[in-house]
Amino acid sequence: LELPNRPTAVFCGNDRTALGCYGALSDLGLRVPDDVAVVGFDNFIDISGGTWPPLTTVQLPHYDMGRWAVEYILSGHAASGEPVQHLATCPLIIRESA
């Protein structure tokens, strides 16, 4: 980020990492989103709802993911190691960081 041709956006693997990114950008004197846009991934509301500016993030279906995990275990697939796939809808939650 200290290079003259720095990135204009950072996509973080989760909202906690995005919070750390906010701090690193601030330490460098950069502003979100004026200098660098930041996007998180999971919509962990304790983080994404409490940042300034509010964090743009991708919503993970946490409840559904938990239900799928329980169904996988109870179905016996987990014991056999048989993989199961689920297609999840993960909407972009647009706030002010990007």
Which residue stretches match the model-derived regions?
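Flexible loop/turn connectors
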Residues: 2-98
